[in-house]
Amino acid sequence: MAVKNMTKKQVQIFFERLREQRPSPKTELNYSNPFELLVAVTLSAQATDVSVNKATDKLFPVANTPEAIYALGVEGLKEYIKTIGLYNAKAENVVKACKILIEKHNSIVPNNRAELEALPGVGRKTANVVLNTAFGHPTMAVDTHIFRVGNRTGLAIGKNVLEVEHRLVKVIPKEFIVDAHHWLILHGRYTCIARKPKCHECVVADVCNWPDRFEFGAARSIAVKNIEAEL
């Protein structure tokens, strides 16, 4: 059975519930300024936040500015991030990005997409994370967790990440859009997981359109039926 798109009311309830569950959502990457966030997100491609944090917890006390990391050089940076996947390419990209930040941006992380995506190793998703998390832009970075949640629940159905991103930006109410990335990624990481999703403990199971949710423990309660009737 195909998943149906959520109604506006379902979307509203969906995010009200996620907000109640996590009033102040935030990234699980450790950072203290926009540059540290940029580096951490760049390193996080095809790596876990836990593995990135282990590396940056040692790196940032030593080098957390473009000048300091550029001074380390590629080989020096590798020593700090060699436990992370694709560390060779990532080290080269980060050092090149630092050089550009120093020469073109006075060592300040740009607050716009075009200049961010011009940095080596920075694609649309990384730019979206930095714009949203560091600068409060209403952008939506779609990773594997958010792609799954969007398609599974009916919140944002799309064949690729760009389709899901555009759909999310379109349907999410303005009051939720700035925090939506964090809510969705955390929901996908801990509840709406790829295998054996925890529908039995999901706070939005009653507004989810995934046909199989009841097989994974979503309650068929009177409250659920009442909400579904309202929708």
Please place each PLM-identified region on the residue numbering.
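Catalytic cores of DNA base-excision repair glycosylases
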Residues: 3-228
